[in-house]
Amino acid sequence: MVEYAWPEALRPSRLTFYLQHNTTRFVSPVTRATQVLRREGARWVAEASFDPLSPARAGLLEGLLAALAGSLNTVRIWDWRREFRTGDPRVQGDVPSGPFSYSDATIFTDGTGFVVGSGNPALAAGAPRGALAIQTGGWWPNGVAVGAGDLIGLAGRLYIATEKVTASGAGTATIPIAPPLREALLINQPLVLTKPTVAMRLVSDDEAANPTRPGRFTAITIRLEEAL
């Protein structure tokens, strides 16, 4: 299997991009009481339409689709609607690195102290597989770390923040996410916050269908699903 990068020159004119959950629903035939079981296998699903495509851009897309060989290979795409997070664009790496603290870590009598820049956002603690929240650090103190719906890349996988989260004065934030964490991750794993990507494969072998109208403009719609 080969993984391809998505060409920057190709942006969809219409897009569907969402997290498809995997649940089982049981309904009592007597009382209609319902039980729902969450199962593993939630995945990102996308449908992207490119219309119109000039001959050059149509060729670029058709070449990529041919290389993907149906569902065999994968391509890394992102949600074109949400390429950047809505939180405070500053991070602790923007804070001058000092010297701003005492060598013995002394704080003031009112409990305040200095904030020292600590780089870009990353995991502040390890997280187990299946976790629904991650502990992070490196945010701008007391700023909005992420907004609800912001996308986060972690270890090559894509997650969505389910709530708006404000960082603490120390620049830490616990962020609720979906889907559950795909794998256990170690402390200091960096967060991708700009165009976080997900590896996807074509749903079928017919995704390269390319109806063309007079004027040599081509329209192509592709369906993709996350490679789990």
Residues covered by each model-derived region:
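Extracellular/virion structural assembly segments
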Residues: M1-L228
